[in-house]
Amino acid sequence: NDIIVGMGEALWDVLPEGKKIGGAPANFAYHVSQFGFDSRVVSSVGIDADGDEILDVFAQKGLRTQIERVPYPTGTVQVTLDAVGVPCYEIKEGVAWDNIPFTDELKRLALNTRAVCFGSLAQRNEASRITINRFLDTMPDGAEQLKIFDINLRQGFYTKEILCDSMRRCNVLKIN
């Protein structure tokens, strides 16, 4: 029961100088793995070249994943800079990480998870929101289990209900 999970969006940040892997849950799982912990990225990518590339990058980094291939495009965020260099983000909707399925494998992972970091952004669509909540409900209860809620208030991709429900379910709150 010592697995640490980053659950939610795995995507490409499309910057003026090119694309790079993005998504707070994936970054969380990667950085945790750098400290020697057994971590997993839980997400979905499309059955497309962008999805293939994300899986390849994670494999090259030695990052363990539980990523489903789904019939939606792999997520992207268009990043542009305004006149004074402040980044603006256009987060595409109807993408793979909006549709993370709850599978038997995911249930088994939840039963062996010590800590999970999940965010508000990945709950913008009902399918992934249901999966995240089922994962949280399946995890063992106890003081040693950490349920870290990463609030991300971007582009209006949240509701009061999602925020309140997630705050009730977590025992660690990360405010960005």
Positions of the model-derived regions?
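Short beta-strand/turn micro-motifs composed of small residues
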Residues: G8, S43-V45, I151
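Substrate-binding N-lobe of the ribokinase-like
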Residues: I3-I4, D13-V86, E93-I100, D104
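Residue-level signal for short, function-critical loop segments
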Residues: A10, V45-I47, A122-R124
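Ribokinase/PfkB-type carbohydrate-kinase core domain
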Residues: N1-V5, V57-I67, A83-I175
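A short, mixed-charge helix-start or loop-turn motif at secondary-structure junctions
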Residues: L11-V14, F118
